[in-house]
Swiss-Prot record:
Transmembrane segments: none annotated. NCBIfam families: PRK15398.1. The lineage of its organism: Bacteria, Pseudomonadati, Thermodesulfobacteriota, Desulfovibrionia, Desulfovibrionales. The gene is adhE. This is Acetaldehyde dehydrogenase (acetylating). Belongs to the aldehyde dehydrogenase family. It comes from Bilophila wadsworthia (strain 3_1_6). Pathway: Organosulfur degradation; alkanesulfonate degradation. Taurine is an abundant dietary and host-derived molecule whose metabolism to hydrogen sulfide (H2S) by members of the human gut microbiota has many prominent connections to host health and disease. The human gut bacterium and opportunistic pathogen Bilophila wadsworthia produces H2S when respiring sulfite (HSO3-) released from organosulfonate substrates such as taurine and isethionate. Induction: Highly up-regulated in the presence of taurine or isethionate. It comes from the Bacteria. The keyword Oxidoreductase applies.
Length: 484
């Protein structure tokens, strides 16, 4: 067992010991679990069937909004209390990101994920009577979670899906299973203490391909939610037999035109592109600056702490962090080496033979007008960002469209020209479009609106919340129940 794995086990043991040492409240004296099955280890089961059965039984116990509100309050409290421990487990298990930023993500989803308050029924009255449209649960939702946000996604999905009256069976990424499973156990403990309802959140102890395939076609699961990259989304689309909500990859460009507040743009891009080592899919992945202000933008970013590397050094970095690079004729396209996804900028630089301060959070490379540069074309999920120089804002927007690859995920612009911002927003047609701020602002971190870790672009739900995880049911009363 390596040092990192030892750290994971140590922190998990500490969290679980604290869980077990806390005395349950009176509400937990009667635990509602599935009868006739393995009741699990605070939501963890050996067999998929037992997990599904337990989740089905739990879901039937949360029909009232008052109960859901109580459960969500318990989840928020437990998530905040364990934000640091969850972050440490995730970082030590995956090696990705930064503990401080993962703490911030965990806090954000606890505080800014909406609950039942975002669900409202609709009534339609007219000469022929009254029709009521209400939000009904799906039942048991299957949620596939990523290694990039293994605890924040569990917390966020748990709040949103329970708000809609559902229970959840999670399928954590195998490389982050301890982090996700620990979060599931801690949240279940909090729910039990608050309400006595067990197994609203469940998972199979050993996630395997076989378990995932069985989950994707399980007859008693009617909704599958996949938060992850292109590969897992593509696989889910091929085999899923139920409705699918999919959050896929992006390659978000940010354009800076000549009217922008350059200092503000530099700070926003630096903060966004370096946050958690750029593993959030909405983070800025390439900068397209109008040439007349490109040097000033670089200078401002370097003054904050970004380190500029040369094209030759960027080539050395690419050889370290990308597979199939340089690409041979007829060979596979370059793609990120998982070993380096989400690693610190200083570690990446030193592996490529480049001396940078240990405090370095972001590497920047000026690729001039090379829109085919590998760092512009490939989404690395690393704190390495290319800067391209466009002749004018129209060319910058044109390049942004090319580099975003039609994924319709996220894009941004720094400008004080309303026409330019309007033009780019319309052209990009992305689920998230950010003006004059870091891209994370669109997820409630420094901007208005709610937070999610499941940005569903491929299937169209966008920034998900409880409304995304309900079925609309209609009840029609003919000729009666109108008061006018």
């Amino acid at each position: 067992m390596d040092v990192r794995q030892q750290d994971v086990e140590r922190i998990v043991v500490e969290v679980l010991k604290k869980m077990m040492s806390d005395q349950p409240t009176a509400a937990a004296t009667t635990v509602v679990a599935a009868s006739g099955c393995d009741c699990g280890d605070f939501g963890l089961f050996d067999r998929l069937e037992d997990a599904v059965q337990a989740a089905e039984a739990a879901q039937k116990k949360i029909s009232t909004v008052a109960m859901r509100d109580k459960i969500i309050a318990a989840i928020r409290k437990a998530g905040l209390e364990n934000a640091k421990a969850f972050a440490e487990i995730a970082h030590n298990e995956t090696g990705m990101g930064r503990v401080s930023d993962k703490i911030a993500k965990n806090i954000l989803v606890c505080e800014r994920t909406p609950g039942t308050e975002c669900l409202s029924p609709m009534a339609i009255s007219g000469d022929m009577g009254l029709t009521l449209i209400e939000n009904a649960p799906w039942g048991v939702i299957a949620s596939v979670t990523p290694s990039t946000n293994p605890t924040a996604t569990v917390i966020n999905n748990a709040i949103s899906m329970i708000a809609g009256g559902n229970s959840v069976i999670f399928a954590p990424h195998p490389n982050a299973k301890r982090a996700s499973q620990t979060a599931i156990q801690v949240l279940n403990k909090a729910i039990i203490e608050a309400t006595g309802v067990a197994n609203l959140l469940v998972a199979v102890k050993e996630p395997t391909i076989e378990v995932a395939q069985e989950l994707f076609s399980h007859p008693r699961i009617k909704l599958l939610v996949v938060t992850g990259g292109e590969a897992v989304v593509a696989q889910a689309r091929k085999v899923a037999t139920m409705r699918l909500i999919a959050a896929g990859a992006g390659n978000p460009p940010v354009v800076v035109d000549e009217t922008a507040n350059i200092a503000r743009a530099a700070r926003s891009i630096y903060d966004g592109a370096s946050f958690d080592n750029n593993i959030i899919c909405a983070d800025e992945k390439e900068i397209i600056a109008v040439d007349s202000i490109a040097d000033q933008l670089k200078a401002e970013m370097k003054a904050i702490g970004a380190v500029e590397i040369s094209l030759e050094q960027a080539d050395a970095v690419a050889r370290v962090v990308l597979r199939n690079y340089p690409q041979v004729e007829g060979g596979k396209a370059p793609n990120p080496n998982p070993k380096w996804v989400g690693r610190d900028a200083a570690l990446i630089a030193k592996a490529a033979g480049i001396d940078v301060p240990d405090s370095c959070r972001l590497l920047i490379v000026d690729v001039k007008r090379d829109i085919n540069h590998v760092f512009a074309r490939v989404e690395q999920l690393m704190p390495v960002i290319p800067l391209l120089r466009a002749a004018n804002v129209d060319e910058a927007i044109e390049w942004a469209l090319i580099l975003e690859r039609g994924l319709s995920h996220t894009a941004g612009m720094h400008s004080r020209n309303i026409d330019n911002m309007d033009k780019m927003a319309r052209a990009m047609n992305t689920s998230l479009f950010v003006k004059n701020g870091p891209h994370l602002a669109a997820l409630g971190a420094g901007g208005e609106g709610w937070t999610t870790m499941t940005i569903s672009t491929p299937t169209g739900e966008g920034v998900t919340c409880a409304r995304s995880f309900v079925r609309l049911r209609r009840c029609c009363v003919v000729d009666n129940f109108r008061i006018v």
